[in-house]
């Protein structure tokens, strides 16, 4: 799932640089949910 990890990394860095806490928490929830499904 390298592509997925790269995609999330970009999303996270964008969210962090944009200082958008809503985006960060939403991305984190999505990231956790997806990784639970993947494993």
Swiss-Prot record:
It comes from the Eukaryota. GO terms for cellular component: peroxisome. GO terms for molecular function: anaphase-promoting complex binding; ubiquitin ligase inhibitor activity. GO terms for biological process: negative regulation of protein ubiquitination. This is Uncharacterized protein YBR296C-A. It comes from Saccharomyces cerevisiae (strain ATCC 204508 / S288c).
